[in-house]
Amino acid sequence: MRIADSGDFIVDLARAGNRTKLNSKQIIIATPSSVASALVAPVSKELATLLDEIPYPPLSIVYLAYEKSAIKTPLDGFGFLVAPAEGLNILGCVWNSSLFDGRAPQGTALLTVFVGGARNPQAARLTDAELVSVAHSELQQALGIASEPQLIAITRYDRAIPQYNLGHAARVQKVESLLKEIPGLNLIGNYLHGVSTGDVIKEAERVAKEVAGLISSRP
C-alpha cells in the first residue's frame, strides 16, 4: 500500500496468483496489529512500529467432553476463571454445552479450557499430550470429574489476545494522532478500544458510518 500524488491509496492485491491494483480514497484495515503494521509501513514507519509493539501472547485451547454424570460440580453457569494465587496452569474454563444448545449430545458436557496467555506463555507451547494431561487433571481438581474425556481437540494460537499493558492508552492516543495525519486511513481491531467481540463491533460500526458519511458527501 502506498499513497499517490493525488492523495489516493494504491493497494497491490494478489489473489490465486493474479495481481491487481486498487485505488481508493478510504482504506479500512481490520487485521491484528502485526498485520496492520506491515500494511501501513510504506505509509508511516512510526505508526507501523507502534502497532508491531503490541504484545500478543500464545494461547492453547483444549476441548474436552465428559459424561455429565461423572462431573460432581453442577455446570449451571458460564464457567470459571482461575486466579493466579490458585497455582494452576489453566486460565479458565467455559462450559459450552451449558451456554449453547446443540454443542454436545444429551448427557454429555463439552468444556473449553484455556492454557497459556500472558500469565504462563510457556504452557501454551506444551505438546498435545501435555496440554491434555494438564487440562484434564486440573479440571478433575476443580470440578470433581471421575472419568476420562470422551472427546479431545486442541486449537493453538501463536498470537492470541492483545495485551493492554501499562502505557497502552497512551499508545492508542499516539496511533490515533498519526492516523489524523493520513486522511482516509482507518484501523479497526481488538487492540485499540476493547478486546471483546462487542467492543470490536461497536468500533467497526462507528468507523463504517464515518467513512460512509465521507463518501456520500463527496461531490
Write out the residue ranges for each language-model feature.
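Mid-domain catalytic core of redox enzymes
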Residues: 2-111, 116-129, 137, 141-142, ...
